[in-house]
């Protein structure tokens, strides 16, 4: 058998190469991230020690001495830093007024809107942070934040979630002396108001800051995102998704080069400006058909910054810019390394009543595109101590029923029933999301209200509801019909306890719908 002898460093290891031959590399590679600096090697059938320089493994050992061999220099690889969750902090934005989600945001911040029967939107980025190992979490509340603050105050970080030297801090939107009654509600300005937090001594080891929105539905490992940011030595990295033509104008759109660097960014372009942002998304790895269906690259509104870059942008470079998507990112593209990170999984922006409604009902499909049930990456929420749901002679098809409900001889199809909901006999739900209640009424209280001709919390007998969102603590009487048979798209009937948005009837929080009402 032919043999090839070579002198090698004592740290050399036998490793497998792609053609199943064996090779020795001059450094131990197990447990390290190595980055290829570019081989630039030449093919050779012979290799002499005279060619060998310092720190070079002189040969690749093969079974056949006559095969072509490639010499690998040790200097061709260097260690690539691994993302450390302890060096990462996240900022979850509480959002502004939330006009597109009105009336669901009439008394609460967007991240406090209930979703999936027992969660709130804020639980999504919170859980993603926890599951990613990020333990330094700031939540910046800005508008209508009472229910959001109350929800966060009751969070239970048990179940093996250890924060160590980490924390969850709620930074409430406040004014300080010298503000001159200035109003600030946009994302970048809101973060700017709390720059002093990141300059604090206890956060001196934070090298990267993730900016997150509190009104998206997705499951993501943020440390993969941060690792891409580190690998490309980016100043800013923007998470993006392929987007279709119908919704592209609702998002920030970007163009990237072959290295993944963002070379152009436009926030919610319309008309000709929208068409100008079309790209061949096959560069992202999409098939030809997928690239045809999704010709845009849309920002998720999820960013990671080097800490010093973020502070410099907000304080010095762009002190008057108030929004990341429309001002900071487009400006930074010109003179910073701004990279794109493709997130090719389920993601939904819960920005409108229709998108909120559709995303909730999609949870009831089999199989769902998104599922809160995943033992490896669970979703956390505030602690509740509720009994199991009681179901009496009911028919339930493709539905989610939350904790502590009472269902009596009802028919539920393709719907979500939230915590503490009470549905009386003969009730029919189809394509309906009921958020539930904040508290119970006793049987005595219910009987007393009915005796007085009043309506208790829940849904009364023989009521038929379809294509509807029922907000918390709603009181819907008996023999009510909510079908919107006339197909009304928009209506404001706050005095009667409801709105219609995009053809979806929204029963307001704490509203009373009297017996026999037809909507």
Swiss-Prot record:
Listed SUPFAM superfamilies: Nucleotide-diphospho-sugar transferases, Trimeric LpxA-like enzymes
Annotated keywords: Allosteric enzyme, Amyloplast, ATP-binding, Chloroplast, Nucleotide-binding, Nucleotidyltransferase, Plastid, Starch biosynthesis, Transferase, Transit peptide
Activity regulation (UniProt): Activated by 3'phosphoglycerate, inhibited by orthophosphate. Allosteric regulation.
Domain of life per record: Eukaryota
GO cellular component, one term: amyloplast
Induction (UniProt): By sucrose.
Family: Belongs to the bacterial/plant glucose-1-phosphate adenylyltransferase family.
Expression sites (tissue/organ): Leaves and tubers.
Gene designation: AGPS2
The organism's taxonomic lineage, starting at the top: Eukaryota, Viridiplantae, Streptophyta, Embryophyta, Tracheophyta
Biological processes, Gene Ontology terms: glycogen biosynthetic process; starch biosynthetic process
Protein name (record): Glucose-1-phosphate adenylyltransferase large subunit 2, chloroplastic/amyloplastic
A Pfam family annotated for this UniProt entry: LbH_GLGC
First-listed, main subcellular location of the protein, grouped into a coarse class: plastid
Enzyme class: transferase
Catalytic activity: alpha-D-glucose 1-phosphate + ATP + H(+) = ADP-alpha-D-glucose + diphosphate
Single GO molecular function: ATP binding
NCBIfam families: glgC, PRK02862.1
Role played: This protein plays a role in synthesis of starch. It catalyzes the synthesis of the activated glycosyl donor, ADP-glucose from Glc-1-P and ATP.
Compartments, record wording: Plastid, Chloroplast; Plastid, Amyloplast
Pathway(s) the chain acts in: Glycan biosynthesis; starch biosynthesis
Cited Gene3D superfamilies: Hexapeptide repeat proteins (2.160.10.10), Spore Coat Polysaccharide Biosynthesis Protein SpsA, Chain A (3.90.550.10)
Known partners and oligomeric status: Heterotetramer.
